[in-house]
């Protein structure tokens, strides 16, 4: 593709970023400013200009969905061979390839879900913690946080106390006591993994780092493979991921980082915006380009989001300007009970007259979404549920996939593979994933798919890209899971004191609220029951209805 064709349709800020293809570059990209477009066009521009070869290019991001979108956009720009992966995916591919050379023997079993394995580890430790769902989720999160900071079990308690960690373990005990119990489970978990020759996703990063640092031959081969680096969502890297990036880079500086400190919402998981904020200290000759023109949201939404950040203590000076025409003012409604809030929101959605898949209900926690889901279903309104749990990691989804896989090797009864799909999924009831699988099957059959095996391959590809099949319904999502997504109409519910902000880090919760607001393109409906969140204080000119 010609250089000028790659630049077509870009605004001046985007052009500056895309054409800056030498040396270290830091792009500060606000919500809805065309970040992915800039990343992919910059890679395509560098390839077209002869600065890099597609096979020498590595683009890193944090979700398989985002990586898949990057690859698709690069293909349309004539760059089909550039590598776009998550940190974990890139590390796993290298680790599996070089394992026989660096470690010897067969590759260990990869633990894709910690739940049941943690339960086994708890049984082998002398912890007094009870392995309930909520407790296992907290322990899993703490282990992942500790390993992202490269903190051993023996150092976990001290690190957790110094970092001001808070827990939601339902046993009424002080966090300090629970930290000590988690340390026991953490040690038992690591011991059990070693005994059974199992590694988890954090180990993938740790082992790849160790391999690069200790094995000179592997290090040189990997560095020869990749020479042109791009890191998306750089505000969310952990110290372990930065160490891995250092191993890939060496002393070279052909790196472009893209991020927005105002959208740092994963410090609880070990992420830190320090690497983004200090990029020019590490690379004094680095260029910095700011993308401040917002193309997603209306001026009303952007102005409100800007005020949210200004009210904080982080002194974020990256203010966005909407490039869209003015629209509707944000709506703020108060309710005496959660149920009255649920009823009103669902009634509004039912009467909105908009495509349901263009509507999202966002909340701080999964539990807040349950009554909304029930109320929508009672009105026969389809829903899509998005949360921090990956769709294809769900036990029920994995069970359904196993059944489909078994059926795919058998000849279709009467030649009708779609009928077979419906038959094998019948025992799973009318769950959302069942309806999504069948809907996908119908659309694939209409497009010419000839076998259940074709559907299975599509589902496996989607699992690898974390791109689950969905139904065209109202999206129900936590604020964290909504990151990187957008809808025309957003209902931000349960904006109550004690829920948002939650925990001790008020500024991170402020950024989370900002992320929620900037998911909306056209309208935002804010609501709360009981005491309003401090974030709503003085937010809107008019009083709550």
Go through the PLM ranges and name each one:
Residues 1-104, 220, 303-306, 518:
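P-loop NTPase Walker
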Residues 3, 8-19, 23-27, 58, ...:
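Conserved helicase NTPase motor core
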Residues 20-21, 101-196, 294, 418:
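ATP-hydrolysis module of ASCE/P-loop NTPase motor domains
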Residues 31-39, 43, 284-287, 293-381, ...:
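Helicase P-loop NTPase motor core
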Residues 51-55, 76-82, 97-110, 122-134, ...:
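Short, polar/flexible loop-turn hinges at active-site or ligand-entry regions and domain interfaces
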Residues 81-94, 379-403:
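Conserved beta-strand -> loop -> alpha-helix junction used to position metal-binding or nucleic-acid-contacting
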Residues 83-86, 203, 207-208, 471-480:
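Conserved two-lobed SF2 helicase motor
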Residues 373-375, 394, 399-544:
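Conserved helicase C-terminal RecA-like lobe
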């Amino acid at each position: 593709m010609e250089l000028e064709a790659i630049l077509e349709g870009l605004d001046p800020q985007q052009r500056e970023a895309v054409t800056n293809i030498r040396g270290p570059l830091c792009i500060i990209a606000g919500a809805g400013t065309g970040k992915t477009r800039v990343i992919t066009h910059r890679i395509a521009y560098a390839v077209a200009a002869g600065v890099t070869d597609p096979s020498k290019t590595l683009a890193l991001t944090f979700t398989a969905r985002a990586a898949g979108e990057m690859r698709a956009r690069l293909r349309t720009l004539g760059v089909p061979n550039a590598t776009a992966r998550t940190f974990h995916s890139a590390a796993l591919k290298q680790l599996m390839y070089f394992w026989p050379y660096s470690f010897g023997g067969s590759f260990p079993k990869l633990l894709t879900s910690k739940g049941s394995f943690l339960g086994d580890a708890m049984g082998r430790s002398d912890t007094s913690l009870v392995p309930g769902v909520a407790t296992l989720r907290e322990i899993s999160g703490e282990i992942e946080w500790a390993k992202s900071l490269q903190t051993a079990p023996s150092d976990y308690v001290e690190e957790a106390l110094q970092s001001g960690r808070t827990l939601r373990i339902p046993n009424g005990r002080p966090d300090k006591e629970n930290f000590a119990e988690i340390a026991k489970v953490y040690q038992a978990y690591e011991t059990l993994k070693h005994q059974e020759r199992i590694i988890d996703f954090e180990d993938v990063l740790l082992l790849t780092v160790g391999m690069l640092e200790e094995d000179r031959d592997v290090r040189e081969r990997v560095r020869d493979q990749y020479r042109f680096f791009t890191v998306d969502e750089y505000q969310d890297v952990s110290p372990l991921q930065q160490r891995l990036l250092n191993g890939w880079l060496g002393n070279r500086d052909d790196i472009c980082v893209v991020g927005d400190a105002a959208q740092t919402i994963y410090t609880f998981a070990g992420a830190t915006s320090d690497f983004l904020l200090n990029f020019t200290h590490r690379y004094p000759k680095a260029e910095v380009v700011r993308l401040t023109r917002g193309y997603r949201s209306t001026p009303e939404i952007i102005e409100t989001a800007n005020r949210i950040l200004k009210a904080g203590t982080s002194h974020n000076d990256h203010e966005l300007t909407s490039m869209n025409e003015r629209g509707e003012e944000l709506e703020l409604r108060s309710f005496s009970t959660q149920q009255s809030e649920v009823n009103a929101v669902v009634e509004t959605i039912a009467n909105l007259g908009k495509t349901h898949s263009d509507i999202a209900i966002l909340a701080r926690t999964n539990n807040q979404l349950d009554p909304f889901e029930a109320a929508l279903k009672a009105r026969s309104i389809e829903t899509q549920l998005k949360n921090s749990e990956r769709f294809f990691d769900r036990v029920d989804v994995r069970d359904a996939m196993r059944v489909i896989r078994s059926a795919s090797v058998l000849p279709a009864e009467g030649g009708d593979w779609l009928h077979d799909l419906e038959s094998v999924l019948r025992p799973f009831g009318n769950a959302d994933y069942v309806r999504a699988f069948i809907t996908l099957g119908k659309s694939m059959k209409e497009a010419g798919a000839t076998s259940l095996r074709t559907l299975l391959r599509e589902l496996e590809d989607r699992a690898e890209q974390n791109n689950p099949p969905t139904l065209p319904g109202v999206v129900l999502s936590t604020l964290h899971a909504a990151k990187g997504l957008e809808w025309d109409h957003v209902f931000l519910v349960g904006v109550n004191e004690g829920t948002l902000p939650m925990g001790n880090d008020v500024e991170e919760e402020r950024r989370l609220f900002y992320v929620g607001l900037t998911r909306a393109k056209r309208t935002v409906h804010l609501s709360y029951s009981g005491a309003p969140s401090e974030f709503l204080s003085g937010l809107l000119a008019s009083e709550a209805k």
